Swiss-Prot record:
SUPFAM superfamilies documented for this protein: Homo-oligomeric flavin-containing Cys decarboxylases, HFCD
Protein EC: 2.5.1.129
Keyword Flavoprotein tagged: yes
Function: Flavin prenyltransferase that catalyzes the synthesis of the prenylated FMN cofactor (prenyl-FMN) for phenolic acid decarboxylase C. Involved in the decarboxylation and detoxification of phenolic derivatives under both aerobic and anaerobic conditions.
Protein's organism: Escherichia coli
Reactions the enzyme catalyzes: dimethylallyl phosphate + FMNH2 = prenylated FMNH2 + phosphate
Signal peptide range: none
Keyword Flavoprotein: yes
Organism phylogeny: Bacteria, Pseudomonadati, Pseudomonadota, Gammaproteobacteria, Enterobacterales
Name of this protein: Probable UbiX-like flavin prenyltransferase
Highest rank taxon of the organism: Bacteria
InterPro entries assigned to the protein according to its UniProt record, in alphabetical order: Flavin_trans-like (IPR036551), Flavoprotein (IPR003382), UbiX-like (IPR004507), UbiX_pad_YclB (IPR032901)
Effect recorded for residue 124 to T: In strain: DEC 1a
Subunit structure: Homododecamer.
Length: 197
């Protein structure tokens, strides 16, 4: 499997880092990373890693200004793309087909080729413009996976929340996260089921 990972300057850099770390442990997945200029700034603000450290997690790292990169062509086959975190600027550009920079171009290619595109939008609150852009992309088949915590898991750390979001992103490609905690039903429902087996 070949996956493109785009990271933009929206807050949420730990999500992108955790995704790359998880994919790094999957030998059957080849990753192509593009970090926007502001993604690099956000990574160094929000994580203990440098942009160089994060780039090293991917099999291939591409210059965000390189419109001639291999992932800018539909003839280079991939299984899809994840933009995590996805800024509202990037989301709007993808919706409009405005392929500014390699993140936007790669997403545009994935869309036109009918491949899987997953966006992890980071903004709050959401304006009508944001929601309309998301709705339009959803109607095009783009998966919107906002980083919502699952409180039924009783997360104790930020990492617990991050791992859950990454697991839900990987679900979109049929990939299993080693730290995924899945809904098992209500405790009383489980007990009733076991008692009646």
């Amino acid at each position: 499997m070949k996956l493109i990972v785009g990271m933009t300057g929206a807050t949420g850099a730990p999500l992108g880092v955790a995704l790359l770390q998880a994919l790094r442990e999957m030998p059957n997945v080849e990753t192509h990373l593009v970090m926007s200029k502001w993604a690099k700034t956000t990574i160094e603000l929000e994580t203990p890693y440098s942009a160089r450290d994060v780039a090293a997690l991917a099999d291939f790292s591409h210059n965000p200004a390189d419109q001639a990169a291999i992932i800018s062509s539909g003839s280079f086959r991939t299984d899809g793309m994840i933009v995590i975190p996805c800024s509202m600027k990037t989301l709007a550009g993808i919706r409009a087909g405005y392929a500014d920079g390699l993140v936007g171009r790669a997403a545009d290619v994935v869309l036109k080729e009918g491949r899987k595109l997953v966006l992890v939008p980071r903004e709050m609150p959401l304006s009508t413009i944001h929601l309309e852009n998301m709705l339009a992309l959803s109607r095009m088949g783009v998966a919107m996976v906002p980083p919502m915590p699952a409180f039924y898991n009783h997360p104790e750390t930020v990492d617990d929340i991050v791992h859950h979001v990454v697991a839900r992103v990987l679900d979109q490609f049929g990939l299993e996260h080693p730290h995924a905690r899945r809904w098992q039903g209500l405790p009383q429902a489980r007990n009733f089921s076991q008692e009646n087996e």
